[in-house]
Amino acid sequence: DEIIAIGATRIVGRRLMTRERLELLVRPEREVSADSVAVHRLRAQDVADGLPLCEAMERLLMFIGSRPLVGYYLEFDVAMIDRALKRCFGLTLPQQKIEVSAMYYDWRFRQLPPYQQHDNADIDLRFSTILQTLDLPMRDAHDALNDAVMAALAFIRLRELRGEAEVAS
């Protein structure tokens, strides 16, 4: 797998700053696989004029700064980014990682009746379910910026539902 698209947006307080976003296409070093085209809907010609990987990573680092990362199933994305950063600059992301699915699980778990609160609680963690339960709009999935926006909206809503006054930016 290669990084072919990067999407990020900023959260300030309880607001999603959609004007402050990063949306990049990355020129892959290998052919874009049919599986990748099917998932991300980006063809070889769509990313042919993308940035070289190391330039895209530099822009991502500048955009992120020291802020925490918020996302849905971040482990995969962070592993891909860390691999690219290690190759380009010899470093990995030190930022705090905030996993939206874990926040959602904790929130839903507390809503279960006591007899259902056990280690194997049946809580649906699909992104579409999370967004629907939180009454948030579902945008086209597997689009880097859309995924970032939806994860940010879920993060903000979950923080509000948990009664947390300030949201990390």
Segments from the language model and where they lie:
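Short, basic/hydrophobic alpha-helical segments
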Residues: L53-G65
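Metal-dependent phosphoesterase signature
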Residues: A38-A56
